[in-house]
């Protein structure tokens, strides 16, 4: 479980 990364929106699923 990873925290929400800045730039995306949910659990580092942005990149």
UniProtKB/Swiss-Prot annotation:
It comes from the Eukaryota. This is Unknown protein. It comes from Metarhizium anisopliae. The lineage of its organism: Eukaryota, Fungi, Dikarya, Ascomycota, Pezizomycotina.
